[in-house]
């Protein structure tokens, strides 16, 4: 019982027998044989290591963590030591209510995290002095790339006519940001022109500028005149700003920036060897429809109660597909939530104190090191100093002394040395820094006992305006109040801690505690991504081991863990394909074939990667229409770069002709990209390499047990065949910026221990059984619900894969009750809705995963059948078609206990429709939310009002 598989998989042998009988097969193997085509079944089990028990894995991960050397690091460059308030670490980061919830599409059961994300947006708007912010992007570098794409889309008619395609980038931008911007700009035909901002001259071809504030050297420049000059030439200005510095520096919004972006890692998020942390993005209100990422806004429920919702979703990939403003889907919701709570806990005074303390220590060290003969090059700075060394001192000398004291500094290519002070730097640490530079220069130094409050920030760049003035940032500064505020919010949300979340295509499985615990180890939390390799041996070993495991599971030869989400993985895979085609003289191939049933990120990613999409039809059984595929492949043969396909398809079925499909595409000289969103039906039974794909991405936050976090963090690694390995993403700081897609070399390295633990503790047998049970559970639900709702698509032998689509269109025709009404009614029973109207409009897609027990599956069936009865009551005239439990759902607590009750059905029917609800009632906070109000008037901060 100490093996994870017995805890992770919710179904035992006895349950399996009962379920197989209901499905109508004699054995689990028979079910699998009838579900997965024989020609793609693996002949041998996966050659993974034997599984570790939870206890053994705990010891193993402790050994790996012990190989990481946690030196005091002042490298900076976008990553800094922080202090995560314990109340946030324990009650948010380590709390399954926060980390197991899904993206808040279902507004009424997401009010807690919507408020937390609204706090984040408000903090960003206040600190940047911009009117609009989204609720996170993947990291600073991808935010920069998104800014460039957005400004390109916003070009004036005259600029478009003139073919303006140049972005001016100041040379003192972080190198990793420039590398990712380059990756993303090239396929869109955008040229990045790097130079000195003081020498910038506008010209007809330049449509935008990107600046860093403070810049990469740490210098704080006054960009006011530059911005005026750019605007006079109709150039937009985007600024990468250190969010903590804006407590002391004039915010870019006050000197005219059009976009302000960056990372909120400094707001209490550990460095995690590079990620995850929440990127931020703020802009002007008039650009809201071009803005990437999710935006939280105010709305009202049907009784007029104020509430939150995700606004302007029609911009996003799941609706707009190839016309979307961005391919982003999963972002960094959990980290944005934590950064928002950090702002709530500290408020303006606390954040200003932290920033001032950092700055004072920096001023003190600047003055002291000048006495030792060092020349500091930044006239104005916040936390970062860059020194020219005295003639008799070398950077190597300083490095040797620093390493002997377990300190990492920043070493510039020209021999300069620098450092960035952070929230954790105290007097003792400052004394160590003093000693390093004094010893190198052969000077005496005096230890100090105290460092006075001092500022060298000139009034031209000094902040004078207040921020975080809303009461939420001024009420919760004691731990008791903060703990209760967090609890008050988490009670409003459905997560896996409450009940099954059956979202199709999302794989909401168990995120086991044994997998999650290592994330809180200081050796994993406190590691800067640019430390010397010998200090990160534990991380490197974990990354190598995990990469080998993923190669075995997918049947591929190479892996990149850099992409921070599934959509980022899609983009990366397509960039790799493009690079390969260019290398063999086939760079003219620019078309991607995509089935009509594909996830919206597929066409959006293809467009971002500079391709043209060609849609291929599906037949009545939900398979790719082979005639249409052959015709489109032949028609576009010379220009075809790749096919993007999901297996099993988004319709939840294994296509019998998948191998033939791969062969047809390869015969055209093109590549096959497999979307790994449905990998939970493949692991151990088949794999993309065996099927015939060339590249696939995985969603570690689906198949491989990493949590969804309410909308991120995710990891979207790509796995590739041998011929594509040379084109995998590199990292500029390590000398190879080819196809770089994330700020950090290994993307969100900090959450890789989860998937590593899942694979190491499940082993071949456990992983394979998990896949079989996921398929069993989906077929069991299909068998239980087929005679009422009906199942839209089935495979060749009448079975579904790991998910199935529930037919709701006939119900709507006969009764007016929609799939949305059913989804909202499920909330009254304590369940999150399945996936609505994807991939087929007017349906619900259900994916139970392997983690649910038979008791939970049966309860869900009881609920769905009871809702079916409620639908029949409307159909038969027993219930009022204009006033019934379905169209009025969900029923919030305040309505149930109200003095007025004017519905023709009882309060009990509304709130306790079946007995099991009494044991685990989830009280909803708001009635059905008005979706149009919040879009007509977008209010993206806590200060918003409809009056």
Specify the residue positions occupied by each region the protein language model found.
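Flexible, glycine/proline-enriched loop segments at strand-loop-helix junctions
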Residues: 104-112, 132-136, 165-172, 212, ...
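TRNA-binding/sensing appendages of the translation machinery
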Residues: 25-39, 257-262, 693-696
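A conserved hydrophobic secondary-structure block that centers on an alpha-helix together
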Residues: 123-144, 163, 167
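Short helix-loop-beta connector
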Residues: 130-131, 161, 555-557, 586-588
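General small-molecule cofactor/ligand-binding pocket signal
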Residues: 133, 191-195, 377, 410, ...
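Non-catalytic terminal extensions of PLP-dependent enzymes
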Residues: 1-22, 34-74, 83-99, 105-111, ...
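Conserved phosphate/anionic-ligand binding catalytic regions in large, soluble enzymes, centered on
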Residues: 269-282, 286-287, 331-335, 420, ...
């Amino acid at each position: 019982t100490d093996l994870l598989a017995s805890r992770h998989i919710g179904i035992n042998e006895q349950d399996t027998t009962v379920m197989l009988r209901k499905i109508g097969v004699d054995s689990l193997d028979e079910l699998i044989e009838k579900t997965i085509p024989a020609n793609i079944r693996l002949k041998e089990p996966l050659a993974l290591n034997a599984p570790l028990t939870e206890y053994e894995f705990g010891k193993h991960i402790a050994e790996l963590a012990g190989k990481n050397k946690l030196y005091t690091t002042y490298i900076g460059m976008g990553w800094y030591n922080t202090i995560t308030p314990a109340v946030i670490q324990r009650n948010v980061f380590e709390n399954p209510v926060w980390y197991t919830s899904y993206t808040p599409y279902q507004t009424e059961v997401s009010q807690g995290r919507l408020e937390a994300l609204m706090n984040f947006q408000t903090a960003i708007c206040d600190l940047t002095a911009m009117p609009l912010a989204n609720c996170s992007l993947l990291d600073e570098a991808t935010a920069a790339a998104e800014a460039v794409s957005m400004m390109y889309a916003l070009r004036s008619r005259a600029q478009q006519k003139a073919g303006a395609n140049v972005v001016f980038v100041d040379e003192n931008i972080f190198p990793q940001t420039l590398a990712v911007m380059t990756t993303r700009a090239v396929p869109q035909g955008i040229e990045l022109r790097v130079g000195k901002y003081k020498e910038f001259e506008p010209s007809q071809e330049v449509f935008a500028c990107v600046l860093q504030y403070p810049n990469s050297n740490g210098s704080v420049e006054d960009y006011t005149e530059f911005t005026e000059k750019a605007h006079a030439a109709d150039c937009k200005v985007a600024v990468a700003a250190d969010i903590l510095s804006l407590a002391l520096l004039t915010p870019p919004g006050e000197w005219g920036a059009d976009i302000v972006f960056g990372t909120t890692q400094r707001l209490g998020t550990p460095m995690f060897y590079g990620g995850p942390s929440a990127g931020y993005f703020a802009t002007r209100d008039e650009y809201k429809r071009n803005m990437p990422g999710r935006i939280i806004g105010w709305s009202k429920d049907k009784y007029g109660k104020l509430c939150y919702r995700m606004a302007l979703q029609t911009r996003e990939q799941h609706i707009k597909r190839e016309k979307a403003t961005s391919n982003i889907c999963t972002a960094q919701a959990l980290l944005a939530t934590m950064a928002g709570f950090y702002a709530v806990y500290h408020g303006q005074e606390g954040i200003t104190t932290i920033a001032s303390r950092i700055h004072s220590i920096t001023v003190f060290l600047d003055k002291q090191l000048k006495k030792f003969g060092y020349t500091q090059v930044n006239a104005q700075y916040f936390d970062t100093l860059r020194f020219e060394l005295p003639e008799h001192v070398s950077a190597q000398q300083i490095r040797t002394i620093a390493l002997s004291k377990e300190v990492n500094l920043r070493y510039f290519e020209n021999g300069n040395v620098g450092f960035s002070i952070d929230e954790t730097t105290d007097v003792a640490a400052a004394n160590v820094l003093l000693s390093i530079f004094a010893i190198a220069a052969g000077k005496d130094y005096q230890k100090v006992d105290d460092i006075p409050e001092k500022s060298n920030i000139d009034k031209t760049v000094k902040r004078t305006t207040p921020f975080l003035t809303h009461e939420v940032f001024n009420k919760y500064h004691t731990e008791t109040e903060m703990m209760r505020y967090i609890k008050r919010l988490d009670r409003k949300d459905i997560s896996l801690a409450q009940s099954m979340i059956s979202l199709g295509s999302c794989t909401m499985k168990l995120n086991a505690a044994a997998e999650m615990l290592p994330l809180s180890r200081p050796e994993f939390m406190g590691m800067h991504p640019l430390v010397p390799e010998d200090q990160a041996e534990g991380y490197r070993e974990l990354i190598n081991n995990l990469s080998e495991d993923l190669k075995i599971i997918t049947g591929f030869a190479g892996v990149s863990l850099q992409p921070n989400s599934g959509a980022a993985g899609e983009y990366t895979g397509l960039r790799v394909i493009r690079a390969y085609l260019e290398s063999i003289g086939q760079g003219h191939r620019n078309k991607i074939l995509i089935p009509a049933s594909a996830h919206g990120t597929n066409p959006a990613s293809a467009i971002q990667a500079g391709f043209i999409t060609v849609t291929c039809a599906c037949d009545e059984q939900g398979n790719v229409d082979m005639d249409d595929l052959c015709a489109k492949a032949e028609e576009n043969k010379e220009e075809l770069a790749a096919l993007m396909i999901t297996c099993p398809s988004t319709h939840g079925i294994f296509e019998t002709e998948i191998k033939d499909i791969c062969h047809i595409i390869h015969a055209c000289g093109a590549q096959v990209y497999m979307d790994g969103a449905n990998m939970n039906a493949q692991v151990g039974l088949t794999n993309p390499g065996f099927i015939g794909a060339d590249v696939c991405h995985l969603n570690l936050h689906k198949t491989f047990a990493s949590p969804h976090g309410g909308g991120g963090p995710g990891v979207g690694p790509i796995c590739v065949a041998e011929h594509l390995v040379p084109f995998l993403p590199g990292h500029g700081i390590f000398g190879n910026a080819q196809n770089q897609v994330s700020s950090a070399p290994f993307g969100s390295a900090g959450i890789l221990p989860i998937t590593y633990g899942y694979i190491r503790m499940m082993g071949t047998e456990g992983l394979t059984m998990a896949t079989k049970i996921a398929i069993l559970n989906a077929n069991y639900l299909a068998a239980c619900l087929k005679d009422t709702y009906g199942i839209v698509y089935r495979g060749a032998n009448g079975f579904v894969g790991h998910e199935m689509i529930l037919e709701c269109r006939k119900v709507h025709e006969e009764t007016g009750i929609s799939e949305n009404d059913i989804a909202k009614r499920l909330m009254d029973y304590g369940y999150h809705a399945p996936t609505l109207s994807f991939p087929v409009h007017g349906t619900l897609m259900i994916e139970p995963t392997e983690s649910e027990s038979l008791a939970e599956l049966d309860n869900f069936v009881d609920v769905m059948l009871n809702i079916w009865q409620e639908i029949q009551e409307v159909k038969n005239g027993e219930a009022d078609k204009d006033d019934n439990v379905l169209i009025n759902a969900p029923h919030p607590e305040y309505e149930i206990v109200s003095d007025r009750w004017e519905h023709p059905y009882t309060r009990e029917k509304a709130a306790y429709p079946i007995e099991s609800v009494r044991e685990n009632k989830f009280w909803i906070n708001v009635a059905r939310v008005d979706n149009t109000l919040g879009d007509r008037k977008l209010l993206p901060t806590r200060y918003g009002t409809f009056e």
